[in-house]
């Protein structure tokens, strides 16, 4: 007899679907409504509990409701040995979709994502929060009618960069250890400078080039220790010029990265300028905002291919049947 695992008497736990910056994530079901949910579990005994902070950040971001691109917290509490948080179940991550599409995205898809990603970070920053773990795994697509919306998740490493009431900025510091994912973190993060708004935006720039190029020059570097690997990534990132990184792609991508790298610690980024860079390029390329992403086309193509294969199989079976029927017609 299988035991049904429940959370808060409202949610049923299903299969594991991933891991976050801290803890594991499971698919679940709202028992009352039947709606699918995501359930994040973290051991109570963990050295640095993060789930309570993360739930608090989600609640700050969702205050007032009706927020686009931020999942809702449906429950947060302690269940036995685990801290638990239940949020809306979303679609696949941009990393998953990047892999699904052959590990390269078109300019059109990248530009449709870019504007939404910048808008999400702009909103997070407007609530006095920086994310500090910008990577394709932490941007997810919605489901159903919201399937074209980009969501930002995983606030396990997030931090307030200013007082929400007075807007007093946190002080500049050096000698900080690396927080985030080395592949996408800013050069200033590598050299130990306290993170601020500029660093989240620089990370988005690296994600966009990763999508267009298929990889980044500092991927796959070998090292004996994590610290040595971080140092090698930092060195390659600093010695690869923006122009080299963005070569053969529209100038707007180099302009984006040069702008984010030019910002000072407390600067408020000009998000409108950054979104406009990509929106104007999108229009100039003759694209339309139809939300037909590369994965939309690939799914249609794969479905058509499957349909053709099924059709061919049916035709072959029909021909074989006709052949056997003709054999039956001949007298022995």
From Swiss-Prot:
It holds the Pfam family Pkinase. Optimum temperature is about 27 degrees Celsius. Loses activity at 41 degrees Celsius. ATP binds at residues 17-25, 40. GO terms for biological process: regulation of ubiquitin-dependent protein catabolic process. Residues 306-332 are annotated as: Disordered. It catalyses: L-seryl-[protein] + ATP = O-phospho-L-seryl-[protein] + ADP + H(+); L-threonyl-[protein] + ATP = O-phospho-L-threonyl-[protein] + ADP + H(+). This is Casein kinase I isoform 2. The lineage of its organism: Eukaryota, Discoba, Euglenozoa, Kinetoplastea, Metakinetoplastina.
């Amino acid at each position: 007899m299988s035991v049904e695992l429940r959370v808060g008497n409202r949610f049923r736990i299903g299969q594991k679907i991933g891991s976050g910056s801290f803890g594991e994530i499971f698919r679940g079901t709202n028992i009352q409504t039947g709606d699918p949910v995501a359930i994040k579990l973290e051991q109570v005994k963990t050295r640095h509990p993060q789930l309570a902070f993360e739930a608090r950040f989600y609640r700050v971001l969702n205050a007032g409701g009706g927020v686009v691109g931020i999942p809702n917290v449906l429950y947060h509490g302690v269940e036995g040995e685990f801290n638990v948080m239940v949020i809306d179940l979303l679609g696949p991550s941009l990393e998953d979709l990047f892999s699904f599409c052959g590990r390269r995205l078109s300019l059109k898809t990248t530009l449709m994502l870019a504007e939404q990603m910048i808008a999400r970070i702009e909103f997070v920053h407007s609530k006095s929060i920086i994310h500090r773990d910008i990577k394709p795994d932490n941007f997810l697509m919605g489901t159903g009618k919201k399937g074209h919306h980009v969501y930002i998740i995983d606030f396990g490493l997030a931090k307030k960069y200013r007082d929400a009431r007075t807007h007093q900025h946190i002080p500049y510091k050096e000698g900080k250890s690396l927080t985030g994912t080395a592949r996408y973190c800013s050069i200033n993060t590598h050299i130990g400078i306290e993170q601020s708004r500029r660093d989240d935006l620089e990370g988005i720039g690296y994600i966009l080039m990763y999508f267009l190029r298929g990889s980044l020059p500092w991927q796959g570097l070998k090292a004996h220790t994590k610290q040595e690997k971080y140092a090698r990534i930092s060195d390659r990132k600093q010695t690869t010029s923006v122009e080299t990184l963005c070569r053969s792609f529209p100038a707007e991508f180099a302009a984006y990265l040069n702008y984010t790298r030019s910002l000072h610690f407390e600067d408020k980024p000009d998000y409108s300028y950054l979104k406009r860079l990509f929106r104007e390029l999108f229009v100039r390329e003759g694209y339309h905002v139809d939300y037909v992403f590369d994965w939309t086309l690939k799914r249609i193509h794969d479905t058509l291919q499957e349909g053709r294969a099924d059709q061919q199989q049916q035709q072959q079976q029909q021909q074989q049947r006709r052949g056997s029927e003709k054999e039956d017609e001949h007298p022995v």
